[in-house]
Amino acid sequence: SIEEAQERAARFAKGMMAHTAEPQGRSMELYQAFVSAVEQHAKTNSDVAFYADCLNVSPRYLSQVCRKLGEKTPKQIIDTTLLACIHQELMLTTHTFQEIAYGCGFTSQAHFSKFFKKLTGMTPSDFRRQNKK
């Protein structure tokens, strides 16, 4: 009958949606775990392979998930998170640039300044001057 056919079609559609929703859920879980790990370790580790290893996935798969759900590469997410930490340090503390650089995992103040300027278009000292209250 038509009703039976509609019922079967509805069950089939529901099964298909459940099947496709599952990977999305796992991807979202991985993405959230990645973002959480980055927030915890951004100052000490900026290597995508480190996070992929912690999450038991390949860097390539992590990259696919991040691009799909966050519309950024893992490296962009790491750098953005690190930059937010640096912004806080520059605005809320009187630490020297060298102290902030080493505290955020940079090997030198020059590398820190270059990273900051590349992402913001200004030097750490210009940023601090403009944002100090």
Q: Language-model segments: what does each one mean?
A:
Residues 62, 111-112, 116:
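Short hydrophobic/aromatic patch on the recognition helix
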Residues 49, 60, 96-99, 109-110, ...:
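Residues within helix-turn-helix
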Residues 55, 104-105, 116:
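Core residues of bacterial helix-turn-helix
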Residues 4-17, 33-47, 65-66, 70, ...:
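Basic, amphipathic alpha-helical hairpins
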Residues 68-107, 129-133:
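Terminal helix-turn-helix DNA-binding modules in bacterial transcription factors
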Residues 21-30, 36, 72-81:
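Short, Lys/Arg-enriched anionic-surface-contact patches
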Residues 45-75:
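Charge-rich, low-complexity intrinsically disordered segments
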Residues 114-133:
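…primarily DNA-binding HTH/wHTH and HhH modules…
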